[in-house]
Structures are given as C-alpha cells and as structure tokens.
Amino acid sequence: MEINVQAIVIDNGSDTCKAGFVGEEAPRSEFPSIVGIDQNDKDSYVGNEAQSKRGILTLKYPIERGIITNWDDMEKIWHHAFYNELGVAPEENIVVLSESPLNPEENREKMAQIMFETFKTPAIYVENQAVFSIYNSGRMTGIVLDSGDSASHVVPVYEGLALPLATSSLGFAGCDLTDQMSLLLNDLGYNLEREIVRDIKEKLSYVSSDFLWEIDDPSLEKSYELPDGQVITIGKELLACSEGLFLPYVFFGTNLDGIDKAIYNSIMKCDVDIHNDLYGNVVLSGGSTMFPGIEYRMYKELTQLAPSTTEIVINAPPERKNSVWIGGSILGLVPNFPELCFDKEDYDEYGRL
C-alpha cells in the first residue's frame, strides 16, 4: 500500500482528547472529551466550548473508564478534532488512534467503521495505549503503568506486542484521587468545586517515600489561594490523596491492589524468561503518574517485591502525561509505517481490523 499523505495522531482519553501530527514532539491540541447539549435548541458543543458553557448545558462523557460508550458523541469529538482543532480534512490523512488496553473487539471495529464510512480516511492504525507508551520509552519491551483520569492499567509489552493475559485494570484512577481529596478537604471544613479540588491535587500533592513516617511532619503544610482570594492551608491531606495509588484498599475501601503490587502480579503472570526485561523497563505513563516522588516510591516498593538480584529501572519521562500521543507520533516516522496501516481496500475486503 502506498499512501502519500500526512498522518495525524489522536489519543482518545476519558478526560482529554489529544490530537496532532506525526513527527511532532507534542500534540497540537488538547481539549476536554465532553459534549454539551443545549436542551432548548438542541445545539451541541464540544471540548472547551462545552466546558465554558457547562452551567447551561447537559454534559455528556462518551468515554467511561477508558472505553467508548457513546458513539454519536465520540463522532462529534473526532469531528471537532479534525476540523476545528487541527483544521484538516480526514479524507486526506492517515489517522493513528489509541485504544484502551482492554478495549472490546466490537469497539475497535466501530472505530474503523466511523473512520472509513463517516470521515472517509484513507487508512488507520489503531494501537494499545501501552504500546505507544513503550515506544516513547525508547525500548520495545517493558511493563507499563498507564494511569489517567478515569482508567488505570498495567500492561506488559514484549517486542512491541502487548500481552493481554497478563494485562490488568486497576479499578481506580485520577478521578478517584480527586474524590478522595475532596473528602479530605471537607473534613477540614472546605467544600470546594471539583475543578478547584483537582487543581489542588495536581499542583500540591506528591507521593511520600514512607507514608507513616512523613504523615505527621508539620513541614508538609502548603498554602493555596482560592479564586475568591482566600488562602487555605493543607498538610497531610496532600500525602493521603496520592497514597491511594499504593494503598487503594485503605483509602477507597476496596480490595484492590496498589500500583506496585499490580505491576508485580502482572510480571508474575508472564514467562519467567522475560521477567528481568520487564523489571528493567517499568514505564510510568499518564497524568496520574505525574506526582513528584512516585518514581522513587515505585522503585522502593518493587525492590521489596522482586527477587533480591533483580535490576529494577523506573522509566518516568517528564513528558509522560503525553506518552501515549508521543508514542503514536514516533510510530508514524517508521519508514514502512504506511504498510502497517489498515486501509480502505482492506476494510472493504475484510470489514474488520
């Protein structure tokens, strides 16, 4: 197959859609993955415009826990990404799409159907988000913890292929940490809007190296100025929020494994011959891995779980919030990339990816 057109990359996140062009270092556009409906005139708004009018719109979230659940609204988001954010005609571009590690096969087929039949794109490439993150790590083998706003997964990848039988969904993500922070702030007497709580979490929270040792340290206290000018002081809550990543059974009241134990369990499900390769490239990806201190804490916890002679390398690139998108951009630079794509002729002949 020879397709002499440019390629665009779209990372379909539950919270944020990221779109841009192959070969670039960062997405051109990032906007909320939401659709707002005006109940009076039935007009629809997407992304930032929907966010700005949220008080008068019914907001809909077409991606839940990483899985597309509303295809009509998802189509609106893709249309917005193509025409409004990037200013491109999809029929003139290869489209690279990310998908959840546990995306149902029927969802993958629906993505192809919309791209070929609605947007008339000449070819597509759909790949597991974790594989894109591995590309961004500079290696082809490793184990990925991808944690965004509403979904977290652990995915071992060997020679560029995800290993589905050892892949796991963690059952908690950034939105759950935001909920936890909201409860902690309520206990302090602060009843704040969710976006403010989220901002506090993202700007001030960090991961402790030893939670029980640090929790009562008075130097933890930090100040945050609210939109009305009031300054509030927050202390141990900043640690307790992020600690949910490692101790979800304490903070979320569940029997879920923390991110460290989930990585260990996933590795143990893989062939013993690749264990060292996986431990040697533990890749952190997604916005909910951006907490300062998470890299050292992960190393510390895995050192206690893995065999004593194991070399553990935590790969936490500073741009890891965009690792999935960047990995897709890197893939598009491979010389034989067009040959790897699924084109319209393939779709017409086989009807499925």
Swiss-Prot record:
Keywords recorded for this protein, A-Z: ATP-binding, Cytoplasm, Cytoskeleton, Hydrolase, Nucleotide-binding
InterPro entries with a match to the protein in the record: Actin, ATPase_NBD
Cellular component annotations (GO), alphabetically ordered: actin cytoskeleton; cytoplasm
Pfam families: Actin
Gene Ontology BP term (one): phagocytosis
EC numbers for this chain: 3.6.4.-
Functional description taken from the UniProt entry: Actins are highly conserved proteins that are involved in various types of cell motility and are ubiquitously expressed in all eukaryotic cells. Multiple isoforms are involved in various cellular functions such as cytoskeleton structure, cell mobility, chromosome movement and muscle contraction.
Protein name, entry field: Putative actin-28
Organism listed in the record: Dictyostelium discoideum
